[in-house]
């Protein structure tokens, strides 16, 4: 996978690509949807947007497809409120995205009314239960296309976007050390299963976890021998009171870690 350097987790991206990703991440933060979500925060959104870009590049998406994928990634968890179920939040997110773009026809994401239904389908589908391991539920996608009145002549494009967002979201399961940890068998695209991509997902999550732990403990360095993802997960599960907003990474810190 040429886009990822051998000395990962840094990615070999051109400046214009970095700017495109950074713009989406900043705009997602500015919506305010993720300000109070501790477990699906901007750290998660930023990584899913980045994974989406890497997958989309390797899959040779068109410029229009890439835009729709990145915006879907930016909004995919906007429906989470901390008390939702896995299925409800995706439908709620599709609804919130619809409300956002309807109220903001001129928006920083450059999404128009014709593109919105496609984004809603992709957001809604990202937590859809699939019957076969690692395979899209095409009947489910067809149902959502009808539900949101998305263009039926673009069903192949929509299926591809659904596949890539699901895989991008799944790759960030490397932020979990035990329950919910990534199982590559659930990935759908060959690109997501590439050793370079799996290694990148694992290492970038270690980098993020180390940075957050440094804030929590007020130290300059975390030992390389420590599994930072596992330690941070234990703190989240057992000592949530330690993890206020002051220990979250700000947007510039997030972008610096990514690039």
Segments the model singles out, each with a brief description of its role:
Residues 2-8, 33-62, 75, 107, ...:
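Divalent metal-dependent phosphate-bond-processing catalytic cores, especially two-metal-ion Mg2+/Mn2+ enzymes
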Residues 2-31:
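Short alpha-helical hairpin
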Residues 25-28, 122-123, 165:
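A generic structural signal for nonpolar/aromatic side chains embedded in well-ordered alpha-helices
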Residues 48, 65-84, 89, 93, ...:
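His-Asp-centered metal-binding catalytic motifs of divalent-metal-dependent phosphohydrolases/nucleases
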Residues 53, 94, 98-102, 106:
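Amphipathic alpha-helical segments within well-ordered protein domains
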Residues 104-114, 122:
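Short helix/loop segments within enzyme catalytic domains
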């Amino acid at each position: 996978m040429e886009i990822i350097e051998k000395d990962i987790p840094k990615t070999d991206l051109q400046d214009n690509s970095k700017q495109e990703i950074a713009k989406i991440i900043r705009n997602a933060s500015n919506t305010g949807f993720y300000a109070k979500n501790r477990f699906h925060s901007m750290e998660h959104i930023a990584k899913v947007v980045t994974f989406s870009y890497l997958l989309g590049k390797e899959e040779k998406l068109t410029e229009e497809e890439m835009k729709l994928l990145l915006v879907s990634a930016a909004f995919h968890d906007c429906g989470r409120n901390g008390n939702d179920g896995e299925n409800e939040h995706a439908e709620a997110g599709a609804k919130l995205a619809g409300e956002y773009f309807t109220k903001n026809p001129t928006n920083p994401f450059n999404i128009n009314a014709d593109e919105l239904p496609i984004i809603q389908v992709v957001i809604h589908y990202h937590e859809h239960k699939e019957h076969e391991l690692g395979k899209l539920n095409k009947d489910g996608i067809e149902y959502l296309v009808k539900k949101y009145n998305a263009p039926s002549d673009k069903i192949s494009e929509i299926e591809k976007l659904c596949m890539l967002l699901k895989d991008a979201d799944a790759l960030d399961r490397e932020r979990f050390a035990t329950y919910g940890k990534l199982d590559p068998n659930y990935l759908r695209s060959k690109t997501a299963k590439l050793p370079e991509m799996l290694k990148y997902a694992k290492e970038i999550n270690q980098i993020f976890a180390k940075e957050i732990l440094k804030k929590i403990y007020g130290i300059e360095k975390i030992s390389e021998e420590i599994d930072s993802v596992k330690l941070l997960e234990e703190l989240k599960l057992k000592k949530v009171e330690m993890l206020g907003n002051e220990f979250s990474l700000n947007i510039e810190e997030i972008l610096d870690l990514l690039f």
